[in-house]
Amino acid sequence: MISAKEVEDAYDLLKAVVTKTPLQLDPYLSNKYQANIYLKEENLQKVRSFKLRGAYYSISKLSDEQRSKGVVCASAGNHAQGVAFAANQLNISATIFMPVTTPNQKISQVKFFGESHVTIRLIGDTFDESARAAKAFSQDNDKPFIDPFDDENVIAGQGTVALEIFAQAKKQGISLDKIFVQIGGGGLIAGITAYSKERYPQTEIIGVEAKGATSMKAAYSAGQPVTLEHIDKFADGIAVATVGQKTYQLINDKVKQLLAVDEGLISQTILELYSKLGIVAEPAGATSVAALELIKDEIKGKNIVCIISGGNNDISRMQEIEERALVYEGLKHYFVINFPQRPGALRTFVSDILGPNDDITRFEYIKRADKGKGPCLVGILLSDASDYDSLIDRIERFDNRYVNLHGNDSLYELLV
């Protein structure tokens, strides 16, 4: 098991390499939740993610002979950037396996940080599939595998986030009540828990997962790590089907509260962080802040830290993020509605169905002359979520056979 001393030893090496990211009180969030909300901005790290800490420390602990062979890793993006940065700085080669679904922004950043030292292999639809391929390649070629989370040196490196948090809080005269920490494979929360429970046991560590990838919750329920059959890859930085054995053992009797955050709430938080605070956070990075909403009554008057774990957000995803946020807020809805095949049907729909401030965001219709009615896909944006019930009443009067796509997961996922 990792001790606080091991985290401190890791920091002795890393402090000359990593950025000591700020711990800042945020007035907007503090006012919103009637608490003192501090943000630990690892999105301002050199690779815009905390992952540099564990990757660099793990590689630095290899022998000269091991490093001369080159290293191998698997990552959904941020760990890969940390490994690439370390490989470049330490002048070694790195073969990096990434899922085919990895955002282009993260792939290009890996190339930028690693330069000629890295070779990227895109394999598998998920991190877990890439990891299997990477481990096989590592064994076949006798190259050290740098695990993204289930490695003691990686965990110790990630734990230096906690060391900085408590040192910064002490300097500001703050006694911390709770720290909200993202969970993917569990490396960050394992390192933070190992350090904080030994040095600052009065501070509660709260684990936060994306609702579509609750692998640590599943491990808690089963009493050991298990593999989820399906995960939502939206929060790609924490979309892991199986948590680490070591990370699970480090936190399962110490972290008492795990929260699962809806991907729509994460999307809403990403937009809020950008528009209100000027912070660019990736989905995984925003998850800790999003979780505040789930226990807002419990945190009133408390000193709270949320870790912005990463800021590697692909700008091309913003449309999807906005869409998910609008759906979560109850403002955007999709229906299949049967339209009479006669002139003026759309005009009637607009005048009779839409409210004065509502809008049609999608309309797909194929006219069939041999039928009296034809199905139409309609997307509607409400000005106020409370108008939903009256909208449904009006749609039912227009077509009592309409279909609300919110209950159809396959079609809804295709649209959103």
From Swiss-Prot:
Gene3D superfamilies: 3.40.50.1100
Entry's Gene Ontology BP terms: isoleucine biosynthetic process; L-serine catabolic process; threonine catabolic process; threonine metabolic process
Family from the record: Belongs to the serine/threonine dehydratase family.
Cofactor field: pyridoxal 5'-phosphate
Keywords, alphabetical: Amino-acid biosynthesis, Branched-chain amino acid biosynthesis, Isoleucine biosynthesis, Lyase, Pyridoxal phosphate
Protein name: L-threonine dehydratase biosynthetic IlvA
One Pfam family it belongs to: PALP
GO molecular function, one term: pyridoxal phosphate binding
Pathway info: Amino-acid biosynthesis; L-isoleucine biosynthesis; 2-oxobutanoate from L-threonine: step 1/1
Lineage: superkingdom: Bacteria
N6-(pyridoxal phosphate)lysine modified-residue sites: 51
Matching PROSITE patterns: ACT_LIKE, DEHYDRATASE_SER_THR
EC number: 4.3.1.19
Catalytic activity line of the entry: L-threonine = 2-oxobutanoate + NH4(+)
Function: Catalyzes the anaerobic formation of alpha-ketobutyrate and ammonia from threonine in a two-step reaction. The first step involved a dehydration of threonine and a production of enamine intermediates (aminocrotonate), which tautomerizes to its imine form (iminobutyrate). Both intermediates are unstable and short-lived. The second step is the nonenzymatic hydrolysis of the enamine/imine intermediates to form 2-ketobutyrate and free ammonia. In the low water environment of the cell, the second step is accelerated by RidA.
Major enzyme class: lyase
Residue intervals of the ACT-like domain: 333-407
Binding partners and assembly: Homotetramer.
Residues where pyridoxal 5'-phosphate binds: 78, 184-188, 309
